Amino acid sequence: METEQLARSHKELRWSLRLSRKKKKTSHKSATIPVYKGKFGQREAERLLWRAGFGPRPGDVKRVKKLGMKRAVHGLVSHRGGTKLIGAGPKLDDPLKPDDIWGHDHIWWLDRMVRSNNPLQERMTLIWHDWFATSNNGVGSQKLMIAQNEMFRRNSLGNFRNLLLNVTQDPAMLVWLSGNENTKYSPNENYGREVMELFTLGAGARYTEEDVREQARALTGFTNEWDEDVGLKDFHFEAKLHDDKSKTIFGKTGNFDWQDSCRLCLEHQDHAGFFVQKLWSYF
């Protein structure tokens, strides 16, 4: 009798677990964003081109509408054939060069936004520029700002981890948030705070002031040279300026460096939700 009851209980338990798994799958599925299955006419094609770029050029709406939504989206996300500028450029006495004269960097970029055959790349470049906000007013080097812009473009649709690693050692960002002055002798908390509050976790996320201080220690070691003719140059990591002692960040302890700092932020429980919500807000 006891054997039969145990067998029945075991069977009921397995059935209960199976139902539980089914419920979990169902609830997870219902939480996903439904795929649009409505019509894809002129209005929808125009909306897609405005959302994924900077609006349609002559002929774009007709072309995208003919492709259909699925193929049009795939073409925007997985652009092939190289990036080219379409149509006539701005009329100037001299060729448009980003580092030529004051203001040409802005005109050069706006021209790319308008004429690029890869609009989502330029849209994402602008998004990353806003996400990891810097300004030449603080950096003081048009050359470094243009290099950062090109870096955002190369990483426009790539892996966010790689982008964060590139941003963390980017010369313009190092100057903007004093990363090039952050040493074991005098830790600077600017980037350590911003990488959590603005870039990966959000204001009010689950981190402490002690985490900020420990992040600053992990991020020590970047520096640069100065030349009176050239200005800021030769940005690099110098081991002797890095704090190689043990640190505790988000409750984890280790001899963390700047790459660990990025990794720990991306592994934090608040990162995924912050990332999706912030990226979604741009569209």
PLM feature spans:
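N-terminal accessory alpha/beta regions
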Residues: E44, R51-N155
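Terminal end segments
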Residues: E2-R8, R14-T32, K37-R51, G55-G59, ...
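Structural motif
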Residues: V35-E44, D100, R115-E122, S186, ...
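Active-site substrate-binding loop specific to GH73 endo-beta-N-acetylglucosaminidase modules
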Residues: E2-A31, V77, A88-L92, W102-L110, ...
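A generic structural signal for solvent-exposed, polar alpha-helical segments
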Residues: R21, Q42, E46, D60, ...
